[in-house]
Amino acid sequence: MRKRLSALAPLLIIAFTLTACGGGSSVAEESFIEGSGAVTNIKLEDRKAAPALSGMTLTGKTFIFNPGKVAVVNVWASWCSPCRAEIPTLIELSKQYPNVQFMGILTRDNPVNAEALARRLNIQYPTFIDDALLLGFKSTLPANAIPSTVLIDKSGNVAARISGEVTLTSL
């Protein structure tokens, strides 16, 4: 019996070590789920005002969004694989539609890591580093699904939401 246990000990140690190598490396990462990519359009009569969007951006500048044009607000984090995957699509769309204001909201992330990713991928639209901005979307966005994207109409109302990775066809 002792020989069996001593023979199994290395296997148990390896198994324990491998289970400790889970997907996320922080509590912030593990508390989020990936959205399904579902698009929800909100009827005109059911639309509610989007929260005021202003604050410090990754570049250290203050940005204030003034309603009057359509806006796309993307919630992301640098550690989120689907977020990183959708960034080139958002960049391409922001270039195709210069009259649409694209913005990002960084959530539960280290701004230094996010700023490095934004610089590497050449994200030109502003990204807010204030998680408190998300509170204004609490009735619109799932609290723990990223990436998430909100479309704001010209009147400043939430017109649609995408829970999950944005694609060229979903936006």
Regions found by a protein language model. Give the residues of each.
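N-terminal targeting signals for export/organelle localization
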Residues: M1-A52
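Thiol/disulfide oxidoreductase modules built on the thioredoxin-like
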Residues: R119-Q124, D130-L171
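A short beta-strand-turn-helix
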Residues: E45-A71, K138
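Structural microenvironment flanking redox-active thiols in thiol-disulfide oxidoreductases
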Residues: R84-N122, L133-K138
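Short active-site neighborhood of thiol/selenol oxidoreductases, capturing the structured segment around
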Residues: T62-R84, L90
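Active-site-proximal beta-strand/loop segments in catalytic clefts of secreted hydrolases
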Residues: V75-A77, I105-R108, D130-D131, E165
